[in-house]
Each structure stands twice: as C-alpha cells, then as structure tokens.
C-alpha cells in the first residue's frame, strides 16, 4: 500500500529556491518514491511557480483565506504531484519569497505564511475532494502553522493526520507579536504555552514543534546540538521535552546533477579512477579567477557571506593561507563589509586570491571540480551541502566540527589516514587559531600526494545520494502511521 504524504514547503527546486530547503523539498518526492511513498508537494503561488504551471486546474477555492480570495491549483514538479496556493494578494509580488526588492522582510509575512499553513491544513485534513493524505510533512517556520491549524482547527469533518516537522535551520523561527493572534482564526485554547504562544508573542516554528508527531533535523549532530542553549535559539527546552521524538536524517545530494563523470559544466569530466583529469579543471579555474597557475593547493569557498558561515574568521586567515603556499577562489555574496574585505584581499594578493560576488550554479560546479579543498568554517551548520558536493568531486572538505559537517566528513587523524577512511579535515571552534591550523593541516596533507589522493577517493566513494535518506524518511512515516492506527 502506498503511503500518501503531503509535503508543505515554502520553496522547492526547480521552481523556486533561496536556500538548501528548496533542494530538500525538491528531492524528497523522488527519494521516498522507491520506498512506497507517494508524495505531493504544496507550494505558495509565487510568480515563478505560477508561470511554470502549463495548464493549472482549480481544485478548491477559498472566499476568505485570512481575508483574501484564493484557489488551489494542481500541476507537476519533476513528474510528481504538485499543489499550488494561488493567492495573488499574498504571493504575486516582486522580490524573493520572503523579502522585497530592497531586501527587507515583507511586513505581512506573518499573514502570508499563516494563510499558506491554513490552506495546507485544509488539504491535509481532507477538505479537497479526491485528495486524501496519510501524513503531512512541514518544513521550517513558513510551513509550521499547517500543523498548528491541523491540531487546533482542522477543516470541518476533517481528520488530524500524523505529522513531521523538519527544522532546516533553528535560527529562523517566525516570531511575531501577540496582537496578530485574533487574525489567525485559531480557537482561544491555541493561545497556550504548549500551543502557539511564545515569549508573549506567536511563534510559528514553536507551534509546529509542539503539534508535530515527530521532529526531524537535517543531521544527527544538529538534532543533538539544538538541545543546548548555544544551538537551540530559545527552543532547546521544547526540543528536550520531545525526547526521542526528535531525530536527525542527513540530506542527500542530487547525484544526477552533481556527478563529475557526466557534468556538462566541467572543462574535463573525471571519476574516482581518473582523478588525474582534475588538473585540467584546476588550470581552467585558475584562469577563470585570474590566479597564478602552480601546483600548490587551491582552496575554494562557496557560501553566503555571513557571521553564521564563519566568514569573518576566514578573512583573518587569508594572509596565513597565502603565506604557506595556498591560493583562494571565493564565490558568494551577503554582508557588504565582508564583500569589500574580500575584494581588498584580492587586491592585496594578486594572482593568489580571486573573488566573485554573487552566485553562479555552473561556476560552483567548476570550483568543486577544480579546487583542491573547500573551506566550510561555519559556526553552526544544520546539514550543509557544499561539503557533500566537495566529497563527490574530490575537493577535500576542511570543516568546523558542527552539525552535518561533523556527520559527513571523516577527519584525517592518524588512525583514519592509516585505515584509508579519512575524507577531510575537521577543526573545533571557529576562531583564528583553529581555522588557520586546519588550513595548515590541509596544506601538509596535500603535500603528501598518496595520502591526499586516498582522501579524495574515499570521499568520492561515499554514498550521499538521496536513496539512503529517502528510506529513513519513509521508515519514519510508516512508523508514525502505524502508531496512529
């Protein structure tokens, strides 16, 4: 029997993406399908999403969804069922899903994503004829209210199905003032410590965590970390109270899109048995970033330029990296002061440091294929994808020991190197001594070609496809449904 799951997400590739959440939401339907799960994704009707619908068919209408007219339309996403909340007053606007064209949060985000949650709860609860689901899976705060509505205000005659709440990043919680509670259309009993109330206001993510049958994060280590004040962001007590209902499942990567043997973006394709071809990609990348061509290690960085990503410390380490024979190519954007500081570093070290501000998907592939090591000094990283891409492409990860980075990279300590299982370099603490020492370790390992090549091969042989992760989610769904019967 096929398990029918409604996946509630505010973004999903290939239709709309601002971060890693979109990669997961887009990959999940195909990942769980071989394990007896039929997944339907529901998305807000942003302009790009509506444009991608060939012939949208209306399935349901709301005359007043938090005060606005809306309809539910159907389509496909990579061959899987797609539902879209077509609510122009909420979603047909310029900018990104969450911010306007000037980069400021939409002032009515509370209302937009409450409406999305209300609609998703109606769909999951059986209000739409011909659409029945066994379980609902919500992603991050933008989808969390779906679980609160199912718990406190299911559709008339609807049923409360089991649910999963996935935390992709605890730093984003959707916390709003108490004055908006009456507009949410929830009963008075929802205003409670075990409901939507959070520090005197309304907490969207908190409400979803309280209502969920099970909570997942995107790595086992992050599932443990969010039980602590350092990573729990104020919700650690709630996470601890949920006990064994909290678990971590590492994200997979799309091995069709990220495969060095078939990648059309590369100057030279290669595999685990043809690593010598990587040098062609290295030479091409050096030329693309106006770097000197030499045999020293080329470090790459592909990231948002933010404090979370440890970029401030990386900036401190550039002189050290260059001083011991390394070079650096960076692709990213974010904090303007950090952007300017990287430009200054490139001016200070011509031919040694190259910088591209912005994001370019094809370039990110070329960097993974041409770089020798990828630096990921994040202060916290729920899962992380760039290190997984690095492993797949023989670009050895140098990572902070946190979250998914700790779960996916095997440190090149003596025992791991001797056993042939080391895949990268881990360091403890995001500060100058730790990061600079990790860079030095990477350079030392790079200068031992046999060891470095063994690390590359071990990483490339590691299975980080969605197959394993898909089975873990499918097993969780089945267990929750069995428990509910």
From Swiss-Prot:
The enzyme's E.C. designation: 2.4.1.21
Pathway where it operates: Glycan biosynthesis; glycogen biosynthesis
EC class name: transferase
One of the record's GO cellular component terms: cytosol
Family according to the record: Belongs to the glycosyltransferase 1 family. Bacterial/plant glycogen synthase subfamily.
Family matches, as PANTHER family: ALPHA AMYLASE DOMAIN-CONTAINING PROTEIN, GRANULE-BOUND STARCH SYNTHASE 1, CHLOROPLASTIC/AMYLOPLASTIC
Described function: Synthesizes alpha-1,4-glucan chains using ADP-glucose.
HAMAP family: Glycogen_synth (MF_00484)
Name under which the protein is recorded: Glycogen synthase
